[in-house]
Amino acid sequence: MNINKGALIFVDLDGLKIINDTYGHEGGDEAIITGAKILKDAFDEFGVIGRIGGDEFAVFLPNQSDFALSEINQLINDKTIYHNTLIKRNFKVELSYGISLFDQYQDLTVRELLDKADREID
């Protein structure tokens, strides 16, 4: 695969500690699974999704550019709304995320791209 540019998304599951404290680890597990399903539904066809640990995920989108940012935002928002209405639960799953774009001219490691995306979280 020839990758000239792309995007790396750093995703944080909002309020996991509160969900764990209020609904127990079962609720926390359900929130993590739902967060993963949101990302899978949004990006599985053209990206690579991984759980970094705890409440953090990363999504690698090869060959994406800044023109795709609004599409990325829309996908995450649409899938979050869908999964929050699909199953009625006592809490909503919300994601915060930052996007780091790169191209073949940048000399950045994956860690540097993740750190850059983490700083972009809204």
Label the predicted regions.
Residues 3-4, 92-94:
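Short loop/turn elements that form and flank the Walker-type P-loop nucleotide-binding site
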Residues 41-46, 77-90:
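Short catalytic/binding micro-motifs of nucleotide second-messenger systems
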Residues 8, 57, 95-99:
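A structural signal for short, well-ordered beta-strand segments
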Residues 59-64, 101-103:
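Short beta-strand-to-loop capping motifs
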Residues 49, 89-90, 96-105, 112-122:
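Cyclic nucleotide signaling catalytic output domains
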Residues 11-13, 63, 97:
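Residues immediately flanking
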Residues 1-7, 14-44, 50-54, 58-59, ...:
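Conserved long alpha-helical elements within nucleotide-processing catalytic cores of c-di-GMP signaling
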